[in-house]
Amino acid sequence: MINKKSTIVVTGAAGFIGSCMAGYLNEQGFENLILVDEFDEDEKELNLHEKKYAVRIERENFFDWLDIEKPDIKFVFHLGARTDTTEFDYAIHQHLNVDYSQKIWNYCTKHNIPLVYASSAATYGSGELGYADDHEIIERLQPLNPYGISKNEFDKWALQQESKPPFWAGLKFFNVYGPNEYHKARMASMIFHGYHQIKKDGFVKLFKSHKKDFNDGEQLRDFIYLKDVIKMCYWFMENWQQATGNWKQAISNGIYNIGTGKARSFKDL
C-alpha cells in the first residue's frame, strides 16, 4: 500500500511536467521522492525551487544508484524524455525514449513496482486513423517525426510484453501548457509563445496551414492545462490498487489519452 512515507520516483523531475508532478506530490504530503533528470540548466533548477525530496539522481547514473542503494520504491512516474520534435537524430530518441524506458519497465517488473509513463499524442501523426486510444490501431499509427516514432515504438513494445509491472499505464498527453515550461525555448507550448508575443508585439503569429480544409490559424488542437494532466497521473497512482481486486470499475493496464476531448483552433485561443 502507498502512504505518505512511501518512496516515489519521478523521472524528468526538473522538466515541465515532471517538476509539477513533484510539486503536486509535495502538496499531497509526499516528500520521500527520488528525482531523476539532467540537472545542468539554471532554468530547470528554478523548477525545483522549494520542492521537497529525498534525493536527486543524474539520469545516466540512476540504474547504478539503484543497484547500490536498493530503495524500497512504491511507484514510478516516468515522465522524462527527449521531447524535441525538431531533433532528427533518431539515435537520441532511441536511447532516451525507447531504451531508457525499457530499462525503467524492466526494473519495475523485476521489483513489482507500478508504473505510469508519458507517451504522447504525437504518436497519432496526422490523425488519419483517428485519435482513439485503441490498442488495436497502435501498430498502424504513422507518427510524423522521430519523437513521435520513438514514443510509438515504446508503446508497441510495452503492449507486447508478457512480463510487466503489477500495474502500468502509458498516458498520451495532448497539447499541454502551463507553468514551468520556461526552459523549453522553441519547444514550449503555442500558448506560452503566443502570450509572450502578445505582450511584446500586441499580436501573435499563427502557423500557416498546410491542409486545404483548414485556413491559416484554424488548425485544431486539443489543449490541456498541465495541472489537469498532473491530477490524472496522480489519480492512476491513487486508484491502481483497485485493479487487482474485484472493484467493478477496476483500471486496466494499457494506454490512455490524456486531453480535454475537445479540439480548439489557434484563432480561438
Residue ranges and their predicted role:
Residues I8-Q28:
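N-terminal Rossmann NAD(P)H-binding glycine-rich loop of SDR-like oxidoreductase domains
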Residues T11, V36, V76-G80, L115-A121, ...:
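SDR active-site strand-loop-helix element
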Residues F30-E31, K110-I113:
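A short helix->loop->beta-strand "cap" motif at the edges of active sites that frequently abuts
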Residues I34-F62:
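Glycine-rich phosphate-binding loop and adjoining beta1-alpha1-beta2 segment
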Residues R59-L96:
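NAD(P)H-binding glycine-rich loop region in Rossmannoid oxidoreductase-like domains
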Residues H95, D99-K103, K110, T123-G170, ...:
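Catalytic helix-loop patch of NAD(P)-dependent Rossmann-fold dehydrogenases
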Residues L129-G130, K156-W235, A263:
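NAD(P)-dependent short-chain dehydrogenase/reductase
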Residues I191-G194, K200, M232-L269:
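Mid/C-terminal beta-alpha module of Rossmann-like enzyme folds, strongest
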